[in-house]
A protein has these predicted regions:
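C-terminal end of P-loop GTPase domains and the immediately downstream helical coupling element
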Residues: 1-46
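Conserved, well-folded catalytic cores of nucleic-acid-processing
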Residues: 5, 77-80, 100, 104, ...
């Protein structure tokens, strides 16, 4: 009888362990799916920001940080993680990250990195618009990645605050491979259309 009971207990323990393992696997899969969906949203807004700013350049690069962080993007990313934000809360978060981008020197640093790369291929007349557009897209990408971290951590920036999260994603995005891949796409999606538009205007 004891052996029989022990065997049943062992079986029950094994079933519980398997259920927990399946639960953990399911959670990991859900987390992965959420992150992929959130990244797709950020990618979409990256190129929206780039296109809008390239078409209508801003009077100063200092405004790029604010222009790059869209409250609607924040709301959509939050929604992926099951969080419903009010428009006001999303705008506050967007403003906070926009200011952080400027305060950490990420805006000017990004413009410098992108300007150096694009100046090799572009005439001066197009350069300003192209740099602003591509930089806006790149900043949107950094801001979006920062928000994904924020919502993954249950709306918590962590011990280092928003500055640490933004700085980390800035550092990740300026690594050679990541930056090169982004710029290759930017040339195709932002710079080439600008050049085509300029050719059409020529007499």
């Amino acid at each position: 009888v004891v052996l029989h009971e022990d065997g049943e207990e062992l079986l029950a323990d094994n079933i519980l362990l398997q259920c927990r393992s399946l639960g953990e696997t399911g959670r990991n899969l859900l987390d992965q799916q959420r992150e992929e969906e959130a990244r797709r949203i950020v990618d979409r807004y990256t190129w929206i920001s780039a296109g809008v700013v390239a078409a209508t350049p801003l009077p100063g690069v200092d405004l790029l940080g604010t222009a790059a962080v869209n409250a609607q993007m924040v709301m959509e990313v939050a929604g992926v993680f099951g969080i419903q934000l009010t428009r006001t809360r999303a705008q506050d978060l967007a403003l906070s990250v926009g200011r952080t981008l400027a305060g950490l020197g990420v805006v000017k640093g990004g413009v410098a990195i992108i300007g150096t790369t694009l100046s090799v291929n572009l005439p001066t007349l197009l350069l300003g618009r192209a740099v602003q557009g591509v930089a806006a897209g790149w900043l949107t990408r950094i801001a979006g990645a920062s928000f994904i971290t924020f919502f993954q951590q249950d709306q918590d920036w962590g011990d280092g605050g928003v500055q640490d999260v933004v700085q980390r994603h800035y550092d990740l995005n300026r690594r050679d491979r990541s930056l090169r891949e982004f710029l290759e796409t930017a040339l195709r999606r932002v710079v080439d259309p600008l050049q085509q538009e300029a050719k059409k205007r020529l007499p």
